A protein has these predicted regions:
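Compact, glycine-rich, soluble single-domain proteins
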Residues: 20-159
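Bacterial N-terminal signal peptides that target proteins for export
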Residues: 1-9
């Protein structure tokens, strides 16, 4: 009994920590026909220090992590290599701030439809893990659907 218990304890101690990130309220801004880009927004909370390092979606040829920042009194959007997610703090990706940019869109983003997005995170040890989410498209000019509803929780998977 002692050997199997010790073996179990060692196996647990040696297992890599799973950097859990909770994704809440993911949504994508709707587009007009032939529009080539839009943003995806959500709230991210990591249990341990992590970083959002990339994202992918079948609806876009290019997906980048962006920030809005003031440069010479002008608000500019630019790509960033990663978004730090300090443990226990909620990072809001929102219009006018950090967001996931979907570019070279393959189709119009129509209100009420769902966009699959794969978020790629890295934990503090450099281990990458992914999380599949479904973000609902909010039509242009529409009030955000679900803004007053309970938040949806989605969890990631290590690869």
């Amino acid at each position: 009994v002692k050997k199997s218990l010790l073996g179990s304890i060692l196996a647990l101690a040696m297992a890599p920590l799973f950097a859990q990130v909770t994704v809440e309220d993911p949504w994508v801004r709707g587009t007009v026909p032939k529009q080539q880009a839009t943003g995806a927004f959500m709230m991210l909370t990591a249990e341990t220090d992590a970083r959002l390092v990339a994202a992918e979606s079948p609806v876009a040829g290019v997906v980048e992590i962006h920030e809005m920042a003031m440069e010479n009194d002008v608000m500019k959007m630019r790509e960033i290599p990663a978004l730090d997610l300090p443990a226990g703090q909620t990072m809001e990706l929102k219009p006018g701030g950090y967001h996931v940019m979907l570019m070279q869109l393959k189709e119009q983003m129509v209100g009420g439809t769902v966009v699959p997005i794969t978020l790629i995170f890295e934990d503090s040890a450099g281990e990458r893990f992914t999380q599949e989410i479904e973000a609902r498209v909010t039509a242009l000019g529409a009030a955000r659907e679900g803004a007053d509803k309970p938040m949806q929780h989605q969890h990631g998977h290590r690869h």
